[in-house]
Every structure is written in C-alpha cells, then in structure tokens.
C-alpha cells in the first residue's frame, strides 16, 4: 500500500489552523491549496488575485488554486458549518457582541454575479456594485467574521436562487 503524501508545510500558525479542516478535503492537493490561499490572503501583496497569490506562495502558476476554487469536490456549506462549530467550541458559551454590516463594493461591468445598479452604503450613493451582509462577533476586543450572505437582486437571480429583500 502506498502511503499518502503529506501536505507541504507553510507557516506554523497557518498549518495549525488549517489542520482543523483537513478532514474536509478528499485529497492532499486540495488541502494544500486551502493552506496556500490562507497564506496569500494574509500576505502583503496589494491585489489578492490567484496569479499574485500563487507567486507569493511559490507555485509555478495559479492553476492548482483555480482548480481548488472551481471544480474541487469540497463543500462550502460544510466548511462554514465546521468553522462556526470551532468558534462555538472556543467561546464555550461566553457572550459575544454581534454586529451586522451591509457592505457594498463598486464593480465595473455586469459580468460578476449579482452586480446591479443599487445603493452602496459605504459609498453613500447608488452605483453599479455588489452588496453583502456580514455577521461579525466581538469578543474580548477581537472582531472576527461569523458568516456572510451576498444580496441577490431579483433581476440577476440564477436558476434555484431565492429572492429576499435587503434587511
């Protein structure tokens, strides 16, 4: 029997954090891509694009990261649920302050999913953009994200999407 290859190490604290999620990935390449994306997101590169992240983490090209995000067999809902359970375990019933934030990003063009001319709160005006509602927790002076939902304008719904008004 061939022993499974170990994932390439990154930085100790990223390796330790990502280890909590290892069982969500069916192969070592997917788990490595998960770790590399974490490395890229905390790096000091200006734009967090897949080509830029692949360079900063030492990959020859961005294809492994692109594959991980587009066709890899991991479940985003399961990952979110697992992450929230980890947070609940760490909090151990201690109270948090809950913050709900509606944030918009201006977007050029209309090819990005759910982009529409709509009110963008942080710009203070109506513009072409995408809006997300995010829930954060504050605990002992630390702020961390809990979950988010992209607002889906009725005109831009895909098959199977459900329309909900903005909160």
What are these regions (language model features)?
Residues 1-167:
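Conserved, well-structured functional cores that handle cations and Mg-NTP chemistry
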């Amino acid at each position: 029997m061939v022993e499974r290859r170990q994932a390439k190490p990154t930085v100790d604290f990223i390796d330790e954090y990502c280890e909590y999620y290892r069982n969500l990935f069916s192969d070592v390449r997917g788990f490595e891509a998960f770790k590399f994306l974490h490395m890229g997101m905390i790096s000091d590169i200006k734009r967090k694009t897949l080509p830029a992240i692949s360079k900063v983490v030492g990959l020859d090209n961005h294809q492994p990261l692109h594959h991980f995000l587009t066709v890899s067999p991991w479940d985003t809902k399961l990952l979110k649920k697992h992450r929230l359970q980890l947070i609940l375990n760490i909090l151990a019933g201690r109270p948090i302050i809950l913050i709900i934030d509606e944030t918009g990003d201006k977007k050029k063009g209309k090819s990005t999913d759910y982009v529409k001319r709509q009110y963008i709160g942080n710009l203070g005006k109506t513009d072409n953009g995408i809006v997300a509602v995010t829930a954060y927790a504050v605990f002992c002076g630390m702020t961390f994200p809990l979950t988010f939902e992209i607002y889906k304008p009725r005109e831009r719904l895909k098959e199977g999407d459900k329309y909900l008004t903005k909160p």
